């Protein structure tokens, strides 16, 4: 598997009058005593520092292999470069970068910023979307019981008893009155419907609103009550 790595070259020229950099050849002791682990860490994780300054003063020519990679650090005393590649590969994995030149004098300085390409890699990412399901709050109607039973046996039932209690809270009319209306109109059947179009516990007409749920039916009955009072149910 091929791997692309960064190699950077930085050239520095000083324009201060009377100042020059003298060449220096590295001795064996200068290259063998270098901290190779530190150089590996810089090349792999901190290339900016290698671009900013040479690894040591003077000229040097450092080459070594570590953990399957060939590392190269060279300088002629005024220019330096570094690179690393897979050791023993028949392909060159060193990518040259733009040179940075810094000119300095006693009055002004001009800097051309170096553009360094980041390593490229093929990366696969998988994304999962979370799904949240929502359910309408449910009510336990079994806790409500009707206290009204008509002579024909009709009652408001547990759902009707709940609806009657809600209407009593909204209108101030007793819950037993609303249970009586529900027992007479629908026998406590939530989905009761007749040919006139009236539907639900309170047998309200479509103009008063939806009767799809218990709360819808309570809202529709309340609208009818606000408009006509109990006369909406012939009382």
UniProtKB/Swiss-Prot annotation:
Keywords: Glycosidase, Hydrolase, Secreted, Signal. Residues 1-28 form the signal peptide. It is found in: Secreted. Residues 95-115 have a biased composition (Polar residues). Residues 117-147 have a biased composition (Low complexity). InterPro entries: Lysozyme-like_dom_sf. One of its GO terms (molecular function) is hydrolase activity, acting on glycosyl bonds. Is able to cleave peptidoglycan. This is Probable transglycosylase IsaA. The gene is isaA.
